[in-house]
Amino acid sequence: MLSLCCSLSGLRTLAAQATANWTIEGILGMMDKSAQDFRTLTADIEHIKYTAVVKDTSTETGHIFVRRDEKMRIEIAKPDLRTILRTGDSLFVYNPKINRVEEFDLGKNRSMVDQYVLLGFGTKSDNIRKSYLVSVVGEEELDHKKTVVLELTPKSDQIRNQIIKIQMWIDEASWLPVQQKFFEAGSGDYFLFHYINAMKNLKIGDGKFKQDWPKSVSRVKPHA
């Protein structure tokens, strides 16, 4: 029993030392270096939504394409086909099952959308510090990658009324997020984005960010 306690104590000490090796300044500095040459990202994506009151977990999978010039496309493949397209201040959600596309003008909500989906992809540390209180949670292995986990607490009351904190798993090789977990306010609910087989700076043509749904599509502009 004594030897087991000593072993556990040793593991805790090693974990504490591993965390101590990374400072917030050091991590954000490495993320800044990665952001300097960030142009594009492609990855398989897993989106998980947990609803606490009914203990329900739903999962969507697909692909994401991001370009630094404010363009993003998410193609959901399972369980139901869906396309989310963002170009600048315009956001489109296309549902082929009902042949309908919802159109949103992001306007003042633009920065909030960027923080939800694009957080950590080419984001400068000054912008992260401006918007969040940052702390280091520790190191974890995820997808056979060594990652450091950051916890971000929004400074904005408006955002904190929706999201109380965000955890980001940062790949220590690429210094890009492998996973982001968003904890919703007052409910115990969370949603998570998991990026698999991520490739940085592959060429993504303009065609990937065009509205390529049928001309017969029904267009709807929901109220903000």
Specify the residue positions occupied by each region the protein language model found.
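Short beta-strands and strand-coil junctions in structured, solvent-facing domains, enriched
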Residues: T51-V53, R73, D80-T83, V93, ...
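N-terminal leader/targeting segments and the immediate start of mature chains
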Residues: G10-T57, K71, W213-A224
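Gly/Pro-enriched, hydrophobic low-complexity segments
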Residues: E102, F121, N127-K130, S135-H223
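Extended beta-sheet lipid-handling architectures
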Residues: A43-I45, T59-T61, I74, R86, ...
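An acidic-aromatic
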Residues: H63-Q115, E184-F191
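Bacterial N-terminal signal peptides
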Residues: M1-S9
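Short, solvent-exposed helix-to-loop capping segments enriched in aromatics
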Residues: A35, M112-R129
